A protein has these predicted regions:
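Beta-strand-rich extracellular passenger or scaffold domains
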Residues: 1-259
């Protein structure tokens, strides 16, 4: 792996060259070559600027613990093995991931995605904050250790599953004060939890299946649950079955359907 001690400074990456600038006035910087298929390890926080489309091959980007990083892409894309973010670190991601690949995010730290990606993401651990409408095409959570936090209305997809899929042991979706509608929630088991951590702003979780459907996961926090079918006739087959935990003090609203 290549280890780069940013120490709060700036680094630019173009082709195989990476240049460390000790301060804003340092326009020349210290340059070294980067080998494809090797990880880059950034330490001690700082700013990274992509100046070309980058393909790391089987290499990824590793960020150490307890620091903040700002990644900017100027419209260029990154492609590689994924992103590993250390505990209590936050990576403000203002770059693009390649649309012909899947971004893998691991590590307990936070990926704060500030630009619509046009790609898919798989989350094994840590937080991913969504700040744009339809931030990712599809989101996959597994193992129960990952969390997706909505920071904008409509930041998930617009298909029947809202573009988020909870596989074995799932993970957490934090509505964070934003309403969200599903036709069905793609949750494999009770490892999935949908919550609202915003204690001052109620979030509406609407599940509007028109055929019988079982949600195996959990619902908690400051959530109002609704199951409404837009039909003058009651849909007797539009049964929503909840066999996980539901723990909310807010209303549960059902119209033209069964719960």
């Amino acid at each position: 792996s290549h280890k780069i001690n940013l120490n709060g400074n700036n680094v630019t990456r173009k082709n195989t060259d990476i240049t460390l600038h000790q301060n804003n006035a340092d326009t020349t910087g210290t340059q070294e070559k980067i080998t494809k298929d090797k990880d880059i390890v950034f330490t001690n926080g700082g700013n990274v600027l992509f100046k070309d489309n980058l393909d790391f091959g089987s290499g990824g980007i590793i960020f150490d613990e307890g620091h903040e990083y700002n990644i900017n892409g100027q419209g260029f894309t990154f492609k590689g093995a994924g992103i590993d973010i250390g505990k209590e670190s936050i990576v403000n991601w203002n770059a693009l991931y390649s649309s012909d690949d899947v971004l893998h995010k691991i590590g307990p730290g936070t990926l704060n995605v500030q630009k619509k990606q046009g790609a898919n993401i798989k989350i094994g651990e840590g937080n991913v904050i969504l700040n744009e409408e339809g931030t990712f095409n599809n989101i996959y959570l597994a193992s129960g250790n990952g969390k997706v936090i909505l920071n904008k209305d409509n930041s998930l997809g617009n298909d029947q599953y809202a573009g988020i899929f909870f596989t074995k042991r799932g993970g957490t979706l934090d509505l964070n004060g934003h309403n969200q509608t599903f036709t069905r929630i793609a949750a494999t088991d009770d490892g999935t939890t949908i919550t609202n951590s915003d204690t001052t702003k109620e979030a509406v979780l609407a599940i509007n299946n028109e055929d019988s459907y079982i949600y195996h996961g959990n619902i908690n926090g400051n959530i109002k649950l609704t199951h409404n079918i837009n039909s003058q006739d009651k849909k007797t087959n539009a049964k929503l079955i909840l066999d996980g935990s539901v723990n909310t003090k807010n209303d549960v609203e059902v119209s033209n359907a069964s719960l």
